[in-house]
Amino acid sequence: MLGILTFILVFGIIVVVHEFGHFYFAKKSGILVREFAIGMGPKIFAHIGKDGTAYTIRILPLGGYVRMAGWGDDTTEIKTGTPVSLTLADDGKVKRINLSGKKLDQTALPMQVTQFDFEDKLFIKGLVLEEEKTFAVDHDATVVEADGTEVRIAPLDVQYQNATIWGKLITNFAGPMNNFILGVVVFWVLIFMQGGVRDVDTNQFHIMPQGALAKVGVPETAQITKIGSHEVSNWESLIQAVETETKDKTAPTLDVTISEKGSDKQVTVTPEDSQGRYLLGVQPGVKSDFLSMFVGGFTTAADSALRILSALKNLIFQPDLNKLGGPVAIFKASSDAAKNGIENILYFLAMISINIGIFNLIPIPALDGGKIVLNILEAIRRKPLKQEIETYVTLAGVVIMVVLMIAVTWNDIMRLFFR
């Protein structure tokens, strides 16, 4: 149960933060956000803000989404003959079109729709008591959809397609950008919880109380300057020295040179065997000043992003489904993190957020990266691609993503449960 809750919480936070990036910059770019939803499925709460956005909470706590006017297939479709009820404003214009069948307004006018245009000419036409009538529709009118969600109509001037090229580009980039920001913030929280940021650039290490070095009397304040014949100047050189000195050896002993108060001495240590790796019982030192901790959030996030990019590069040149993880693998990892405490959950949250940010920047049309490529092409050509071409390109991207997701999920299930 804890694993399920952790998965829902981590995935939910990441998706909502991602979608909020699209939401915020869409509004700044003059694009109408028709709905900002937390969760999926049937709605359990809805509120229309003064900004015209419907804020909804939906029953399945799995992420969320934004509906931008003119983005994708977000259009209002009314079939000929559909019964609706119209609420009129004082000036005679329609301010609400109710498609839900529920009675929301005692004075609403029933109509069977024969024609409508909510994008350009803003009118609705149909039969009212067997008489055909046409009504002008207010620019900020709302539509009550079949499930009861009330959203603004989407006239052309507030649609995604009519934003500036830079407005569209930043709107598409903002989702992944928020994922990177979330990663940095969570790493900050971790660093402050741990009392500082790891200092891997010095040979002043933290000697663990029950470790191999502590058992031979090495004090916490000592510096490790040499292991065997290998100089030690930082954390990486210590790791390499231990691995080199213990390679192909059983129960090895190490000659460790330490420096304390200006004098050097050598101690002989028997490292602890941990599943084939030999440990001295040391950790990197910690920088606890505010500036180091602040910068540490950025550097830790950057290091994580570089590792993910390196793994992605290897995957491109050496494709292997076993190197990919879908929802099942993420659930398994979240369950493992939940068993090991809040710090592991936070680390998992930061890493997955950065991972999703990078993944979304891959130039596949269905992803934000693909949309950004289309924005760049539009900027170069000084005109957008034809809507039909953009639709087909996006559809191809969706097909690729669906096939990949099915393959990865199937591979996850087979790998985790049947091997």
Swiss-Prot record:
The chain crosses the membrane at residues 169-191, 345-367, 388-410. It holds the Pfam family Peptidase_M50. Keywords: Cell membrane, Hydrolase, Membrane, Metal-binding, Metalloprotease, Protease, Transmembrane, Transmembrane helix, Zinc. It is an enzyme of class 3 (hydrolase). InterPro entries: PDZ_sf, Pept_M50_Zn, Peptidase_M50. GO terms for cellular component: plasma membrane. The keyword rRNA processing does not apply. The active site is at E19. GO terms for molecular function: metal ion binding; metalloendopeptidase activity. Zn(2+) binds at H18, H22. It is a multi-pass membrane protein. It is found in: Cell membrane. Its main location: membrane. This is Putative zinc metalloprotease spr0242.
